[in-house]
A protein has these predicted regions:
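Short hydrophobic beta-strand micro-motif common in sensory/regulatory domains
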Residues: 1-90, 96-97, 101-112, 140-148
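Cytosolic covalent-transfer regions centered on His/Cys nucleophiles
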Residues: 28-31, 53, 64, 92-288
Length: 288
């Protein structure tokens, strides 16, 4: 499930693409979609607006170490146009408005400027996810939390996958967020590919973007149910706003959450909307 969790947007695009070219009576395997998804990852990287973006890093590392850091960033983000590293004493004479993303390895710079994000000297996996989110325009936990609502939260038993989807859809319908077209699109998608994402989590969603507003309906189940040959006890029904090129970034924002098994367990430990909001807010605040 690594590709499915890490490259959620590319996987969803690959799923939609394969569904349009494969006969509807054929079930597409996750591994087959994952293979196609890798091609979408490469295409997105090559054609991403990130190619025009510039990154500034303030660091007191030795030159040999800054070169290593710079190379690590460019290797992980080949679409970035420029990574410039400057010492602390050059910050006051640098036009930071020329840069899309600004980071530092220095704790004092980070503490004194809330627009500058801290990264590690060693550039670890957390730093990679942090830069991914920054490049995608992530401003903070609110970008994700706005898609959740207590009116779209359910904790209780469910007899089957279809019953969970129906309940989550009906909650969204009552709030004026969904219609029957959306529901049928979700079920059509379920018929051709699995929406199990690992870590006992399923994310049913429509074949295409249909809703006027992005939203996420949540179900936490005290007893796991069977979901495409796997067991599930937490379900996110995700719908992305249509006709909004920036709305699809929600998939990127969610990938950090859905690949984090510890976080999902914390959500299930106290199955309330208040705890869900608290846990989601904390993991993104800790990241930044």
């Amino acid at each position: 499930f690594n590709i499915k969790q890490k490259y959620t947007l590319a996987y969803d695009l690959a799923s939609t693409f394969t569904n349009t070219i494969i006969p509807s009576d054929k079930k597409i395997l996750d591994d087959e979609i994952a293979y196609v998804a890798l091609h979408f990852v490469n295409y997105i990287d090559e054609n991403s607006p990130q190619k025009k973006k510039r990154m500034l890093i303030i660091s007191s590392l030795r030159r040999s170490e800054t070169i290593l850091l710079q190379n690590n960033i460019l290797r992980n983000f080949p679409s970035i146009k420029e990574v410039k590293i400057i010492p602390k004493n050059s910050l006051s004479t640098t036009n930071v408005n020329n840069y899309n993303v600004i980071c530092t390895t220095e704790n004092d710079i980070f503490i004194n400027n809330n627009k500058i994000q801290k990264i590690s000297y060693f550039f670890n996996d957390t730093d990679i996810k942090k830069i991914e989110l920054l490049l995608d325009g992530f401003n903070g936990p609110k970008d994700i939390l706005d898609c959740f609502s207590e009116d779209l939260f359910y904790y209780g038993d469910a007899p089957s996958k279809n019953a969970v989807i129906k309940r989550l859809y009906e909650m969204a319908y009552k709030q004026g967020l969904a219609d029957e077209k959306l529901y049928h699109s979700i079920m059509n998608h379920e018929n051709v590919t699995s929406t199990y994402f690992g870590n006992y989590l399923a994310i049913p969603h429509p074949e295409i973007f249909l809703s006027e507003t992005s939203f996420i309906s949540v179900a936490i189940l005290p007893k796991p149910i069977l979901w495409d040959d796997e067991y599930v006890d937490i379900v996110f029904l995700v719908s992305i706003q249509k006709n909004n090129p920036n709305a699809f970034k929600l998939w990127s924002y969610l990938s950090f959450l859905i690949s984090n098994n510890t976080t999902l367990e914390e959500i299930k430990k106290e199955p309330t909307f208040q705890n869900l909001s608290k846990v989601i807010s904390k993991i993104y605040e800790d990241l930044f």
